[in-house]
């Protein structure tokens, strides 16, 4: 197969109401709620969290490695599909995908929606949860990799490597979407950590004590 090409493009617009925002369009008072996509936010964390918990505690319920392996892989697969196709697009306006053209060339596309109208609708709580879940779970699997490696548990090592591959693929794809396909990943990751740390520090210092959280979502018909 021919070598792959990479490009970073804006996320395509359409005239449909964003999934999960139909009630918000009918009732503008819902725009200020804490989570505008509560179900998407829940499942963004549920599948990957469940995979970690099953891996940690499967020995309490079954001695069968095959059973544990199947359940963990099922949850990892569900998580990979959900994060790649749903939560990234709805929670932060990012999407990455791949296609092969008629000449057999593989193209990797990293899309981002950076328009002011969209960014003004992004829920900051959901955005923070998205990135924390995307980053922290690979860290856990990295620790499990070390435990399995030094504990000489090679059959579990295979399972952990599958988990790392699936989690790292989404993390890599969304970092590329957020910072550009041509930017070095190490510098992009460093910039991301600095940006998030600065934002959290500013929020803590500037938010009045006991004040309600700011409302960042405004109803609009633009995706």
UniProtKB/Swiss-Prot annotation:
Transmembrane segments: 35-55, 56-76, 129-149, 154-174
Keywords: Membrane, Transmembrane, Transmembrane helix
Entry membrane topology: Multi-pass membrane protein
Disordered: annotated segments: 1-30
Biased composition (Acidic residues): 12-25
Entry-linked InterPro entries: TVP23-like
Biological process terms in GO annotation: protein secretion; vesicle-mediated transport
Top-level taxonomic group: Eukaryota
Pfam families for the chain: DUF846
Localization (cell): Membrane
CC annotations in GO: Golgi membrane
Coiled coil regions in record: none
Family per record: Belongs to the TVP23 family.
Protein name stated in the entry: Uncharacterized Golgi apparatus membrane protein-like protein CG5021
